[in-house]
Structures are given as C-alpha cells and as structure tokens.
Design a protein with these regions (language model features):
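OB-fold nucleic-acid-binding modules
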Residues: 1-26, 51, 68-134
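Generic beta-strand structural signal
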Residues: 56-58, 73
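Beta-strand/loop nucleic-acid-binding surfaces
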Residues: 31-56
C-alpha cells in the first residue's frame, strides 16, 4: 500500500491504493475535491461522486495519479476509483496552520483553473459587486 509521499514518484496515469484522512472538502465549478493526508504528507483528491466526510479516514483505491508542472501531484478517484471508510484513524502530523495554508493554495489554484476553463465566472472585487467604489 502506498503512502501520500509514494504517490509523487508514480507517473501520471498510474493507479495506487493508499490510506489517508480527509482534512478539507471543497467544490469548484462542479468538481468535488478533498485535501487528504497521512504521516508522509498531504495531497489533493478529485472525488467525483465518492461520498467522504471531513475528519474520517479512508482507503482510496484505484486512485489515478496526476503529475503537474512545478512538481506537484494529485490523485483522482472520479473515473473508477473509490473511497472506503476504515476504522483506524490515519495519523496526520502536520499542524493546523500548515494544513490550512495548503488548503488555501490548492483551492485557489482550482478556482483559477475553473475560471480559465469557463466553469466559474471571472473574479470581481467584492466592493464592485455591492455597488461600492474600488
């Protein structure tokens, strides 16, 4: 069974099974995402229709690895993979501040990508939306 860190050494398209705890959930332009982690690190999972709960640990099966420019990795279970809850709690040694920073970076990247693909409206300053001056 792979660790989150092991996923980084796999080629795009390779599949792996790993265990991790769901730390954050978000949706961008119809894509459901989770930030998950184990003792070795954190990664993003595209969930598809899989039902997961924040704070629970899962075994992610047939997770397809995706490698991106800049050296970051994510996985997807949206096309045939699955997430099965497990009784054991997966340890995540990263502190809450680090987890939150990672979540903000990954969810921000997804929003930017969604806007570029036309799944989200262009960003507009909140003051402009409420009729205020910028």
């Amino acid at each position: 069974m792979a660790t989150v860190k092991d996923l980084k050494s796999l080629a795009s398209g390779e599949e792996a099974t790993f265990r991790a705890r769901v730390l954050r959930l978000w949706e961008v332009g119809g894509l459901r995402m989770a930030l998950v982690g184990d003792e070795s690190g954190l990664t993003r999972v595209e969930l598809g229709a899989a039902a997961v709960e924040e704070g629970r640990s899962y075994e992610f099966q047939r997770a397809a690895v995706r490698q991106y420019e800049g050296g970051w990795t994510s996985v997807s279970i949206a096309d045939g993979g699955e997430a099965s809850p497990i009784d054991a709690e997966v340890a995540v040694p990263q502190d809450e501040a680090y987890i939150e920073r990672t979540f903000k970076i990954l969810s921000g990247i997804q929003r930017k990508k969604g806007r570029g693909e036309g799944r989200l409206p262009p960003w507009e300053h909140p003051a402009k939306r409420s009729g205020g001056s910028t």
